[in-house]
């Protein structure tokens, strides 16, 4: 199947399509605490759409921001493209669609940002680490782990 990726403006039609796809993502229950987007969640981000014969197959949105202070990872003022969301319909996963979306955003951000950054709350952390580390050649810099304490409200 032939697909294309393009950057899109947040028109009412684009926002409605992204919100509908994010509702599908929420229904999957594949990410801890994920809820469908509102227009406010998307506005202010750069939007990249993966389209094919079946319409909208996936999306990535994010934005460039400057780090505020020095950290063990990077110096203050470093420009980073923060990927807020990357989603591909289940029937189009494991076909290179997500990687293509990421690489398109990466090429678009080149020259504006020094790094690409992403956080994830997926329940399938092994697969997502493989995707970002092995397929997209990202570096692993930090992790945030949680444990529910028994007997706590």
Model-derived features with residue positions:
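Conserved beta-strand-loop-alpha-helix junction that forms the acyl-donor binding cleft
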Residues: 93, 116-129, 146-150
């Amino acid at each position: 199947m032939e697909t294309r990726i393009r950057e899109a403006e947040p028109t009412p039609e684009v926002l409605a399509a992204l919100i509908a796809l994010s509702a599908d993502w929420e229904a999957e229950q594949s990410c801890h605490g994920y809820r469908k987007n509102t227009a406010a969640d998307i506005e202010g981000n750069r939007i990249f759409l993966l389209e094919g014969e079946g319409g909208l197959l996936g999306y990535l949105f994010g934005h460039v921001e400057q780090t505020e202070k020095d950290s063990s990872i990077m110096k203050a003022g470093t420009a980073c493209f923060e990927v807020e969301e990357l989603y591909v319909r289940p029937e189009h996963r494991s076909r290179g669609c997500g990687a293509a979306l990421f690489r398109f955003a990466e090429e678009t951000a080149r020259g504006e940002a020094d790094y690409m950054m992403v956080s994830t709350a997926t329940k399938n952390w092994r697969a997502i680490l493989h995707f970002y580390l092995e397929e997209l050649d990202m570096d692993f810099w930090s992790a945030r782990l949680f444990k529910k304490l028994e007997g706590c409200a």
